[in-house]
């Protein structure tokens, strides 16, 4: 889908030796953009949750410069497996990632490229993102989310009485 920003990802990765793993369907136009930018890629469709977990384990980094997401679950999934995340400084992605990801402008190829290069070239920065990501995931544990909902319920109840 267009919000996944694959065209800008292809432009971003042009000339950077890598294998882009894509989970989900690709349109012919998207495949053409990847090929035009000489991006080495593989994609899988309709895979199990277990296979998705394997994909994260096999990855070096999650590049997720989406222009719109309802929540941004891939951020947490990647962080749960100890992977650094590059994502949009935008909408739900910023809220989910906080300071635990390299935040980029999803509408700027140059911004995304700078983020990618920083994460792959700077070992200390990458380690810092992994450590912060491990902590970030804890914010979204079932226990912590239940506590947040309970606090919200109490606040709403208090304002009605």
Where are each of the predicted segments found?
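Carbohydrate transferase catalytic cores enriched for Leloir-type hexosyltransferases
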Residues: 1-161
């Amino acid at each position: 889908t267009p919000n996944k920003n694959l065209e800008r990802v292809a432009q971003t990765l042009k000339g950077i030796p890598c294998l882009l793993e894509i989970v989900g369907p690709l349109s012919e136009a998207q495949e053409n953009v990847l090929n035009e930018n000489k991006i080495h890629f593989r994609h899988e469709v309709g895979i199990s949750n277990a296979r998705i977990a394997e994909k994260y384990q096999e990855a070096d980094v999650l590049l997720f410069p989406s222009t719109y997401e309802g929540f941004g679950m891939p951020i947490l999934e990647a962080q749960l497996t100890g992977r650094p995340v590059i994502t949009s400084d935008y909408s739900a992605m910023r809220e989910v990632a906080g300071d635990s990801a390299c935040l980029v402008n999803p509408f700027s190829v140059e911004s995304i490229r700078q983020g990618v290069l920083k994460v792959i070239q700077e070992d200390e920065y990458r380690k810092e993102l992994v450590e912060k990501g491990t902590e970030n995931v804890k914010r979204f544990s079932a226990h912590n989310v239940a506590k947040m909902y309970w606090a919200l319920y109490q606040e709403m109840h208090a304002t009605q009485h």
